[in-house]
Amino acid sequence: MPVLHNRISNDALKAKMLAESEPRTTISFYKYFHIADPKVTRDALYQLFTALNVFGRVYLAHEGINAQISVPASNVETFRAQLYAFDPALEGLRLNIALDDDGKSFWVLRMKVRDRIVADGIDDPLFDASNVGEYLQAAEVNAMLDDPDALFIDMRNHYEYEVGHFENALEIPADTFREQLPKAVEMMQAHKDKKIVMYCTGGIRCEKASAWMKHNGFNKVWHIEGGIIEYARKAREQGLPVRFIGKNFVFDERMGERISDEIIAHCHQCGAPCDSHTNCKNDGCHLLFIQCPVCAEKYKGCCSEICCEESALPPEEQRRRRAGRENGNKIFNKSRGRLNTTLGIPEPTE
């Protein structure tokens, strides 16, 4: 029986990936379809992906599959053919190819079985996830952006919206998709006569969100097919204006794809124009925040003076301090006040 999980350290795997000479292609895809036995499907897919040297993150559940992966360029077409042949429901599945890709997005394959492929918090037995809104293609998206009766709803987290979004799109302020769904219904109650256009990174969240809005009495609901990634690709291919401004946040080592030249966000430490996310270099913190090059040098990649000082301590002392510590929120949220370390320690007063 082959080993169906990784047994090599992350550091060794990352070093091996960085030493590779063959280019890689970053791909994302999802499909809502019934999987009778996610564990069996997971094990079969793990062997298929491993044989093709695929890295990335894959979630499976009874409701379908959600994947963000990195494939050696020479294996992309073989991967596509084998994926399509794996299950009739996957035949012809759209694969979103990354827009701004150095091929260094993942260095290990992690494949997990979950209750849902997107954590939505929905427990209504009458909810029909297949009753989705209408798809929009790139040209239709641009037409809707010029329609005064249309409202664009961003179904991504606040830190994704902060660095890039469609023109005049509404933010549903939340840290998670689970929090956003009820908020979207509440915020749109006064606009049921409007055309609701929902979007996300690659389509998986806005597809389910469109079904949730219809379940809650909204009848004019659309969502962008393939999300921001597919929209930007098709708009460029067709010579259309790209109406997404800024950067598209992605959940891998790149942390973003440049869509337009505009920088609409600011460094969370000094306020300078910047849209580069990073994780605090202190292993006891790892807060996700935006940091400009000047502050990165000043704070040595950390989110605060406290973390900067702690990360400079001997490794043994750092481990001692981390032991038993319960970290706080791992994502900086502008609405919660100024930037703070997640260590649960007050910043020194100035």
From Swiss-Prot:
Check the record and name the Pfam families matching this protein.
Answer: Rhodanese, Rhodanese_C, UPF0176_N
One MF annotation (Gene Ontology) recorded for this entry: oxidoreductase activity, acting on paired donors, with incorporation or reduction of molecular oxygen
Question: What gene name is listed for this protein?
Answer: trhO
Which sites are catalytic?
Answer: C200
Q: PROSITE patterns in the record, alphabetically?
A: RHODANESE_3
Q: What is this protein called?
A: tRNA uridine(34) hydroxylase
Q: Per the UniProt record, which EC number(s) apply here?
A: 1.14.-.-
Q: Catalysed reaction per UniProt?
A: uridine(34) in tRNA + AH2 + O2 = 5-hydroxyuridine(34) in tRNA + A + H2O
Q: What is the organism of origin for this protein?
A: Escherichia coli O81 (strain ED1a)
Q: State the UniProt keywords alphabetically.
A: Oxidoreductase, tRNA processing
The similarity annotation says: Belongs to the TrhO family.
- The UniProt entry's coiled-coil ranges are none
Instruction: Report the protein's function.
Output: Catalyzes oxygen-dependent 5-hydroxyuridine (ho5U) modification at position 34 in tRNAs, the first step in 5-carboxymethoxyuridine (cmo5U) biosynthesis. May be part of an alternate pathway, which is able to bypass cmo5U biogenesis in a subset of tRNAs under aerobic conditions.
The family database entries (SUPFAM superfamilies) matched by this protein are listed as:
Rhodanese/Cell cycle control phosphatase
Q: Where is the Rhodanese domain?
A: 146-240
Could you mention a single GO BP entry for this protein?
Answer: tRNA modification
